[in-house]
Each structure stands twice: as C-alpha cells, then as structure tokens.
C-alpha cells in the first residue's frame, strides 16, 4: 500500500514521500503521466510501469509487510502478487536514493498539464 511505499522511500532517501515526491515531475504521485523530466521522475515512471504488471492486487490499498535489515529492504512476502508489489516499491525507493543528486526543487510541485505525451512502458 501507499503506507509501505512511503516508509521505504523515507528509509532509503531520508525524505518524506508526500511532500518530496507526491507531486514531483510528470510521473510521481497521483495521475502522473508524460515524458519524465529527469532521473527522479524516470524512477516514478518505471514504478508505474511495474505496477501495471500487477494483476491480482491493488497497489494503493493492499498491504504487505517487509523487513529493514542492515539498511536493506527485504520483501519477505508469501503471496506472489504482494511480493511483486513490494519489489516494485523497493526498486523505486532505491532508484530515488540513487538519484538524490539530480533531485530538482523546480519539479517538486510540477503542473501535470505541462506534461507531454506519455512514454510507453
């Protein structure tokens, strides 16, 4: 669910997910679509594509559990769809951390109507 995703992002980046990424660029947060503005926005684009592959669970509401051991996210989930969802969230959290140096405050609250035609997954 969005709760686990937010926790992972905080653990990996040290940033609070909603204010930092909830409205970032064209692909982060609700209703995001369009050509990614930068590497951080591309992380969110790839994450949305990952979610599109999920067929038996709802990323917004279904809950899974994970472990945080030695600063590493471990998706220890038995349900195949929830495990895949956890892996999607883990991947975006790591991607956001790896691209912290390109995080651009001008994209933090980006007007979605400025976003051009979306890339395809």
Curated annotation (Swiss-Prot):
InterPro entries given in the database record: PLipase_A2, PLipase_A2_Asp_AS, PLipase_A2_dom, PLipase_A2_dom_sf, PLipase_A2_His_AS
Membrane spanning residue stretches: none
Cystine pairs: 26-115, 28-44, 43-95, 49-121, 50-88, 57-81, 75-86
SMART domains: PA2c
Site (Cationic membrane-docking site (MDoS)): 112, 117
Primary localisation category: secreted
Top-level division of the source organism's lineage: Eukaryota
Keyword ATP-binding part of the UniProt annotation: no
GO function terms (MF aspect): calcium ion binding; calcium-dependent phospholipase A2 activity; phospholipid binding; toxin activity
Summary of the tissues where the protein is detected: Expressed by the venom gland.
Region (Important for membrane-damaging activities in eukaryotes and bacteria): 105-117
Pfam families for the chain: Phospholip_A2_1 (PF00068)
Protein keywords: Antibiotic, Antimicrobial, Disulfide bond, Myotoxin, Secreted, Toxin
Keyword Disulfide bond: yes
Site positions for Hydrophobic membrane-disruption site (MDiS): 114
Function: Snake venom phospholipase A2 (PLA2) that lacks enzymatic inactivity. It shows antibacterial activity against both Gram-negative and Gram-positive bacteria, including methicillin-resistant strains. In vivo, it causes local muscular damage, but no systemic damage (intravenous administration does not elevate plasma creatine kinase). Also causes an inflammatory activity that is demonstrated by mice paw edema induction and pro-inflammatory cytokine IL-6 elevation. A model of myotoxic mechanism has been proposed: an apo Lys49-PLA2 is activated by the entrance of a hydrophobic molecule (e.g.
Family according to the record: Belongs to the phospholipase A2 family. Group II subfamily. K49 sub-subfamily.
Assembly and interaction partners: Homodimer; non-covalently-linked.
Protein name as catalogued: Basic phospholipase A2 CoaTx-II
Organism: Crotalus lutosus abyssus (Grand Canyon rattlesnake)
């Amino acid at each position: 669910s969005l709760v686990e995703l937010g926790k992972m992002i905080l653990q990996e980046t040290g940033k609070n997910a909603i204010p930092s990424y909830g409205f970032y660029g064209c692909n982060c947060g609700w209703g995001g679509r369009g050509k990614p503005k930068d590497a951080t926005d591309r992380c969110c684009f790839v994450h949305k594509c990952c979610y599109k592959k999920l067929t038996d669970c709802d990323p917004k509401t279904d809950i899974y559990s994970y472990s945080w051991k030695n600063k590493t996210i471990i998706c220890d989930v038995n349900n195949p769809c929830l495990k895949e969802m956890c892996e999607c969230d883990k991947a975006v959290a790591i991607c956001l951390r790896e691209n912290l140096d390109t995080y651009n405050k001008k994209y933090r609250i980006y007007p979605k109507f400025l976003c051009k035609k979306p890339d395809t997954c």
